[in-house]
């Protein structure tokens, strides 16, 4: 492919388009906390908007914010950032944001789900753009505090002001994203690749492969503790090597026996059939069928999600991990 992605870094971006703007961060969970703290530490004016007093409210207060009810945060805001769960955004928009929309306001997303699948259809006189961190919220905060940043994707859906991209990049900079890089994309590309990635590898694929390998060893009579270190705990070290030095760096660090077994057996486990299933999963996202299924599941109170969490919490691998926590923590590097 000849296309080269447009990537922006700190030197291409300025915070100016966000200076003096009143920013409402709706939600104070995984991303909400990271965004509110990073944006505030970057000198921007942030108010946290929440539905009710509770855990998030207390956490925001403990972090030095004075949270407001969602609509009160929105009424005052120039920029509204949606960091409540994807499935909650439609209702929050309809009941707490739409009634207070003014021409020239900005609606900002960290994932394109609600715009791409048309659950939220804003009027044409506001800007709609996205800054999507390519990493979990607590890491977005941790990297920022340590002087780094998690890469982000930026995209513009509506550009009423003519300045939407500059504003997206200003937020990306304040979040720490442009310390690494901000890649320009579309809502469609971000939404589909993010869902495909988390389902097939980041969350679904990795979790199920680790679980399947662990359970296979245990079924064969090996000790759960040995199976846990082999199939779950050591994966971090292997992935860290890939992160730091690429696949070749990882391969240099493991034995020739592991390399040979890896090249031959890996392809038998992750084979054509697995690739066919990956394509099937990706098509289900692209066709909108996954979104339809998730909205329907949410409408029934998310029973499959609750069951998954309950089963994982009780699983032998999770219990074994908890039992080994002390050993794992003792071994963790101290600096
Ligand atoms: N979690 C991540 O690391 C991550 C990464 C990239 C993008 N995103 C995107 O960021 C957005 C926020 O996701 P998150 O995982 O940080 O959310 P989350 O589940 O951590 O959000 C929790 C927050 O939303 C509030 N909340 C929960 N249910 C609510 C409801 N029904 N109505 C109103 N508020 C409610 C909670 O009080 C809490 O403050 C989503 O669009 C998600 O796709 C998340
Ligand atoms: C952190 C992830 C998996 O990358 C994000 O996309 C999410 O939905 O939580
Ligand atoms: Mg996601
Ligand atoms: Mg993601």
Swiss-Prot record:
Residues 308-335 have a biased composition (Basic and acidic residues). It catalyses: (2R)-2,3-dihydroxy-3-methylbutanoate + NAD(+) = (2S)-2-acetolactate + NADH + H(+); (2R)-2,3-dihydroxy-3-methylbutanoate + NADP(+) = (2S)-2-acetolactate + NADPH + H(+). NADP(+) binds at residues 28-31, 52, 56, 86-89, 137. Mg(2+) 2 binds at residues 194, 230, 234. Disulfide bonds: none annotated. Residues 186-331 form the KARI C-terminal knotted domain. The active site is at 111. Substrate binds at residue 255. Its cofactor is Mg(2+). Its EC number is 1.1.1.383. SUPFAM superfamilies: 6-phosphogluconate dehydrogenase C-terminal domain-like, NAD(P)-binding Rossmann-fold domains. GO terms for biological process: isoleucine biosynthetic process; L-valine biosynthetic process. It is an enzyme of class 1 (oxidoreductase). Residues 5-185 form the KARI N-terminal Rossmann domain. Residues 301-335 are annotated as: Disordered. Mg(2+) 1 binds at residues 194, 198. Binds 2 magnesium ions per subunit. Keywords: Amino-acid biosynthesis, Branched-chain amino acid biosynthesis, Magnesium, Metal-binding, NADP, Oxidoreductase. Pathway: Amino-acid biosynthesis; L-isoleucine biosynthesis; L-isoleucine from 2-oxobutanoate: step 2/4; Amino-acid biosynthesis; L-valine biosynthesis; L-valine from pyruvate: step 2/4. One of its GO terms (molecular function) is magnesium ion binding. Involved in the biosynthesis of branched-chain amino acids (BCAA). Catalyzes an alkyl-migration followed by a ketol-acid reduction of (S)-2-acetolactate (S2AL) to yield (R)-2,3-dihydroxy-isovalerate. In the isomerase reaction, S2AL is rearranged via a Mg-dependent methyl migration to produce 3-hydroxy-3-methyl-2-ketobutyrate (HMKB). In the reductase reaction, this 2-ketoacid undergoes a metal-dependent reduction by NADPH or NADH to yield (R)-2,3-dihydroxy-isovalerate. Belongs to the ketol-acid reductoisomerase family. PANTHER family: KETOL-ACID REDUCTOISOMERASE, MITOCHONDRIAL (PTHR21371:SF1). NCBIfam families: ilvC, PRK05479.1. This is Ketol-acid reductoisomerase (NAD(P)(+)). The gene is ilvC.
């Amino acid at each position: 492919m000849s296309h080269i992605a447009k990537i922006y870094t700190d030197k291409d971006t300025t915070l100016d388009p966000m200076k003096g703007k009143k920013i409402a961060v709706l939600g104070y969970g995984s991303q909400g906390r990271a965004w509110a703290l990073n944006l505030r530490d970057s000198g921007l004016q942030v108010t946290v908007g929440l539905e009710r007093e509770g855990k998030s409210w207390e956490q925001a207060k403990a972090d030095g914010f004075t949270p407001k009810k969602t609509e009160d945060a929105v009424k005052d805001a120039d920029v509204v950032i949606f960091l409540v769960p994807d499935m909650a955004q439609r209702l929050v928009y309809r009941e707490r944001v739409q009634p207070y929309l003014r021409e020239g306001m900005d609606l900002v997303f960290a994932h394109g789900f609600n715009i791409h699948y048309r659950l939220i259809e804003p009027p044409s006189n506001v800007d709609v753009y996205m800054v999507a961190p390519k990493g979990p919220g607590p890491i977005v905060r941790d990297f920022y505090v340590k002087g780094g940043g998690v890469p982000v994707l930026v995209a513009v859906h509506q550009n009423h002001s003519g300045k939407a991209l500059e504003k997206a990049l200003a937020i990306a900079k304040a979040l720490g994203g442009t310390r690494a890089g901000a890649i320009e994309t579309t809502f469609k590309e971000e939404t589909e690749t993010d869902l495909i990635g988390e389902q097939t590898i980041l969350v679904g694929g990795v979790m199920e492969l680790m679980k399947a390998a662990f359970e296979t060893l245990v079924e064969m009579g090996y000790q759960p503790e040995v199976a846990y270190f082999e199939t779950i705990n050591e994966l971090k070290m292997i992935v860290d090597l890939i992160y730091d030095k690429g696949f070749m760096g990882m391969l240099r660090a493991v034995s020739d026996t592991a390399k040979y077994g890896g090249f031959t057996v890996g392809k038998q486990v992750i084979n054509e059939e697995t690739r066919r299933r990956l394509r099937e999963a990706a098509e289900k996202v692209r066709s909108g069928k996954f979104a339809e299924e998730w909205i329907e599941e949410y409408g029934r109170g998310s029973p499959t999600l609750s069951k998954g969490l309950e089963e994982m919490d009780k699983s032998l691998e999770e219990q074994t991990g908890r039992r080994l926590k002390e050993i794992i923590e003792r071994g963790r590097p101290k600096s």
